[in-house]
């Protein structure tokens, strides 16, 4: 089980169930990928679309777990309440995933609150693939902060450690 991996998020929704609930599957999917892109008013997420198809209105989502949970937006806007809830959201998602049947896996950087790697847009060999947004090099400087009190990295590291201990 994992929240994020090296690839995009495909919104494989159970369309017959959605229809039985009176939900338009296409509109729901469009809302989800635009919300996690950050273009829906009130969205906390910062991500990008991948393989948007105008004809079918299909798209996938890209971004790191922390950025999709709102940490990046909170840091940019200096919004302390948003930062606090975004960190809780990130840890809650990992906690829920960790207690599903199976083996929980972290995407590289989830344990240190790794943000999107927007620098991929400056690399002509990588700019055409928005999946590179969450494929940036591991941030070793932030990894060292997991041992420093008061950092986001320590907060997440300790939170994930507690989840692991509960699971054991």
For every predicted segment, state its role.
Residues 1-168:
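Active-site and adjacent substrate-binding regions of carbohydrate-active enzymes
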């Amino acid at each position: 089980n994992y929240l994020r991996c090296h690839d995009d998020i495909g919104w494989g929704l159970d369309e017959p169930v959605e229809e039985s609930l009176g939900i338009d599957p296409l509109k729901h999917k469009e809302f989800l990928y635009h919300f996690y892109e950050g273009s829906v008013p009130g969205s906390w997420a910062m991500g990008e679309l991948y393989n948007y198809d105008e004809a079918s209105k299909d798209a996938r989502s890209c971004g790191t777990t922390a950025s999709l949970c709102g940490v990046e937006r909170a840091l940019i806007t200096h919004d302390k309440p948003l930062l606090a809830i975004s960190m809780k959201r990130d840890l809650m998602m990992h906690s829920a995933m960790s207690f599903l049947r199976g083996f929980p896996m972290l995407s590289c950087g989830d344990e240190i609150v790794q943000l999107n790697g927007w620098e991929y847009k400056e690399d002509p060999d990588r700019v055409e693939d928005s999946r590179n947004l969450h494929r940036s090099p591991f941030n070793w400087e932030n990894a060292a902060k997991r041992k420093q009190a008061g950092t986001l990295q320590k907060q997440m590291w300790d939170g994930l450690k507690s989840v692991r201990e509960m699971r054991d």
